[in-house]
Amino acid sequence: LLAELGNNEGVGFDPAFVAARNPTNRAGVRFVADFYSEKYADEKADFVCCKMTLEHIANTEEFVSTVRRSIAGRRDCIVFFQVPDMSRVLRDLAFWDVYYEHCSYFTAGSLRRLFERCGFEVLNTTTEYEGQYLTITAKPATMRLLKTPASQSEIDRLLAETQNFSRRCGEGISAWRNCLKEF
């Protein structure tokens, strides 16, 4: 869609991509059946889009740093990532969004700090789809940024939300068990 709308070229990276099952005849779009890595740094991008992938990566700092090293000195390259918003999961007791294949979870603050640590200047973070997802837009930083730790109030809030989530999930399970006993 991005390639079509802007008359652009696009390259997708997916280690599970099978061309025979996913035929594409879209002009300017091609797929690489591999994990993205620095060996693809010669793929010059104006825009790097990574949606609903980062939460599946255990070493997120290494991956985001790889993206940063790959775009090197191209200061005008914009990166856009989208991940589930853990704050919403905790706040709204959205336990159905805690998947076994998700090994990394983010709040707006933790996502921002990750990108700053990896050499990006964060342009903005937003929530999308009624707060279900976090998005971050960034570009390569022109200078080394200071590492900003989480504030104590943010840590306290997340701790309280996590404890509340645990308690409320237990209560929800008990309520469902009682409901099922009635059948």
PLM regions and their residue ranges:
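Short, glycine-/aromatic-enriched active-site segment of Class I SAM-dependent methyltransferases
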Residues: 79-104, 108-112
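A conserved beta-strand element that flanks and buttresses the S-adenosyl-L-methionine
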Residues: 46-49
